[in-house]
Structures are given as structure tokens and as C-alpha cells.
């Protein structure tokens, strides 16, 4: 049985265009994207949606810097776009000359401003990779080993590892050590996840982390000792409707949010008893 049922799970806001990604900014706002290019900024207290930019394509994962510039993976345009708070959109990276991005899926910053980006490739194509985009926009491929649809990713709270949700063959969460924008050690399997499609990741202050699963409609929790538990599960697929990404927000990062690619809303649960680990919001400057 789930450790937390859906009693306290609710719709945060609705009327979004199949949101795949969700993130909290340094300004406390909640950010999301739509499948037709929409970029949403949402006031947490007022639950007011502002559509303030358009990337022109299918928006997936996102990350923010210290100035609340948003870095959006726009899959069908093969690029990561930078969106300023004023809504100005510019291309931040499209990969390398030798290996252009095909399906950029999720970005995650480290403290130095390196942006790690998963490029999922095609379903069962075994053609994914992981990039690192330096704060000046210089891009390098740092991993081709983990090629079976690398999906959501997160830098560990201590900045030592990049965790990646591998959606296929087998579904699992992996990690490898990083330093100065480079992969500096071997890949390790953190947990295998048979019969699910892991998508998003979020770290908690107690050393556990959450996994949002595109299939089935479930959010899992990996405890510090490695045990796997179910945090929330929705067999009807209504409150959790293909929950693709998760983040913590609210005044003390104790409110859990999730995006629902299969529906039109963001979900919220303020009673999980968990707090999110602080994210990295680097100062990118004018890069």
C-alpha cells in the first residue's frame, strides 16, 4: 500500500497544455511548460498562471539560475532555450557540431553553473547521450554509455554525482561522479525499477529521493538505505496523470508538486512530511 494515499493530493492549477516539466525558481514561483511552446510562471500563494513566453516547440524539463532565467529543453527543436524573466527567448545550446541534440529532455545545474542535459534519443533506439553546457554556452558530450533513453536528471545535494532516470533496458536510476562539468568515474546502478517508466527525480533533506513515473501513475521514494517504497499511487490516473516530473516548493520546500503529461494540471501535496533539498541556482551572468 502507498505510504501516503491521495487524501492530501490536490490540483494546484489547471488549464495547462499537457505539462511535462515542473520546477521551483529562486523567486518561489512554480514554472512549467506546455507541449506547444508555452512557458508558464505560477504564483504559489495566489495560484495564478502567467503564460509569459513561447519556445515554439514541445517543452520538457527545465532549470533556473539565480536571476530566475529559465533553461528549457524543447525536444522537437533540438535545443535548450534560455527564457528571461521578461519572456525573451534565445537558444542556449543545441549540442555539438559532431553530435547535435535530437531530443533534449531534462537539464540540471551544479553549483558552478554547469548545465547537465539528458538527450533521450529515440524510444528503444539506444542513441541517447548526456551533455554538459558550461556557463559560457560551450557544450560537450560527457556520457554515451547510458544511451537507453536517459530521462530526468538531478545533481546530488553535495554536488558530487549526477543521478539519471533511465527509462529503458532495464528501467533504473543510475549515477556517476561529476567534477567541473565532467564525468569522472564509472556509472553505478542506484535502484532497478522493473515494470515502470521512471521519468523525474527530486532529492529530500533526509537523504531519500523521489521518482515520478510516466507509467504507471506513481511516485516512488528511495530511502537512504536503498529500500524502494511507494509514496503515492493513483490507479485511476486522475490526480497523478502520467506524473513526469516532481519538485518541492513553498516557503520551506515542504510542498510537493508534480507535472502531469497525461492531463492539464499540476498536482500538489503539502502533507508528505518531506522537505526538498536545496537546489543549485548559479549566477550565470550575461552568458
Where are the model-predicted features located?
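Short loop/turn segments that connect beta-strands within beta-propeller blades
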Residues: 43-47, 84-88, 133-137, 177-182, ...
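A short loop-to-beta-strand structural motif that recurs across blades of beta-propeller domains
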Residues: 38-40, 79-81, 128-131, 172-174, ...
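Short, solvent-exposed loop/turn segments at conserved positions within beta-propeller repeat blades
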Residues: 35, 75-76, 121-128, 167-172, ...
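A short helix->beta-strand "capping" segment at the edge of beta-propeller domains
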Residues: 1-16, 93, 187, 284-285
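Blade-level signature of beta-propeller repeat domains, shared across WD40, Kelch, NHL, RCC1
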Residues: 245-287
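Blade/loop signatures of beta-propeller domains
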Residues: 1-7, 35-36, 42, 119, ...
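Beta-propeller fold detector
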Residues: 50-54, 90-94, 141-144, 184-191, ...
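Beta-rich, blade/repeat-based domains predominating
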Residues: 14-27, 55-74, 97-118, 122, ...
Amino acid at each position: 500500500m502507498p505510504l501516503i494515499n491521495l487524501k492530501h493530493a490536490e490540483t494546484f492549477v489547471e488549464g495547462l497544455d499537457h505539462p511535462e516539466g515542473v520546477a521551483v525558481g529562486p523567486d518561489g514561483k512554480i514554472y512549467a511548460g506546455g507541449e506547444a511552446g508555452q512557458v508558464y510562471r505560477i504564483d504559489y500563494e495566489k495560484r495564478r498562471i502567467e503564460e509569459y513566453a513561447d519556445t515554439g516547440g514541445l517543452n520538457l524539463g527545465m532549470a533556473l539560475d539565480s536571476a530566475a532565467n529559465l533553461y528549457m529543453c524543447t525536444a522537437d527543436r533540438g535545443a535548450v532555450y534560455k527564457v528571461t524573466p521578461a519572456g525573451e527567448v534565445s537558444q542556449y545550446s543545441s549540442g555539438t557540431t559532431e553530435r547535435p541534440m535530437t531530443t533534449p529532455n531534462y537539464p540540471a545545474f551544479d553549483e558552478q553553473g554547469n548545465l547537465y542535459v539528458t538527450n533521450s534519443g529515440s524510444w528503444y533506439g539506444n542513441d541517447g547521450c548526456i551533455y554538459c553546457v558550461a556557463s559560457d554556452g560551450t557544450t560537450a558530450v560527457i556520457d554515451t554509455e547510458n544511451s537507453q533513453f536517459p530521462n530526468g536528471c538531478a545533481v546530488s545535494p553535495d554536488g558530487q554525482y549526477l543521478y539519471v532516470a533511465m527509462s529503458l533496458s532495464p528501467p533504473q536510476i543510475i549515477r556517476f561522479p561529476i567534477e567541473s562539468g565532467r564525468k569522472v568515474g564509472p556509472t553505478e546502478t542506484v535502484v532497478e525499477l522493473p515494470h515502470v517508466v521512471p521519468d523525474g527525480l527530486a532529492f529530500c533533506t533526509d537523504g531519500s529521493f523521489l521518482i515520478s513515473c510516466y507509467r504507471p501513475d506513481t511516485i516512488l521514494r528511495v530511502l537512504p538505505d536503498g529500500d524502494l517504497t511507494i509514496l503515492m499511487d493513483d490507479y485511476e490516473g486522475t490526480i497523478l496523470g502520467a506524473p513526469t516530473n516532481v519538485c518541492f516548493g513553498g516557503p520551506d520546500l515542504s510542498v510537493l508538486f508534480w507535472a502531469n503529461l497525461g492531463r492539464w494540471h499540476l498536482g500538489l501535496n503539502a502533507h508528505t512530511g518531506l522537505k526538498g533539498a536545496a537546489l543549485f541556482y548559479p549566477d550565470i551572468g550575461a552568458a
